[in-house]
Amino acid sequence: MALLQQEKQQIIESYRLHDTDTGSAEVQVALLTSRINQLSQHLQRNPKDFNSRRGLLMMIGRRKRLLNYIAKHSPDRFRELAERLNIRVKK
């Protein structure tokens, strides 16, 4: 269920801000979005998996907090990130 190392490295390389960046808010949001998408597909196949549903809701909450941080500190980067990840945001 977790991301493969290659997938994770590919996401980090495409969303990092500089060469050694592996943990910026943008990278964390991109990794969480990938895991959220995988878990959503799992829950469509297994609708009674309530523990995974709770984990999904926790990931969505963490991603929301990170997005709020990015929006507060850098609105331009926030809009670009939301567009690249196809995340709906309130106006």
Swiss-Prot record:
Part of the 30S ribosomal subunit. Forms a bridge to the 50S subunit in the 70S ribosome, contacting the 23S rRNA. This is Small ribosomal subunit protein uS15. NCBIfam families: S15_bact (TIGR00952). GO terms for cellular component: cytosolic small ribosomal subunit. One of its GO terms (molecular function) is structural constituent of ribosome. One of the primary rRNA binding proteins, it binds directly to 16S rRNA where it helps nucleate assembly of the platform of the 30S subunit by binding and bridging several RNA helices of the 16S rRNA. Forms an intersubunit bridge (bridge B4) with the 23S rRNA of the 50S subunit in the ribosome. It comes from the Bacteria. It comes from Synechococcus sp. (strain JA-2-3B'a(2-13)). Keywords: Ribonucleoprotein, Ribosomal protein, RNA-binding, rRNA-binding. GO terms for biological process: translation. CDD domains: Ribosomal_S15p_S13e (cd00353). Belongs to the universal ribosomal protein uS15 family.
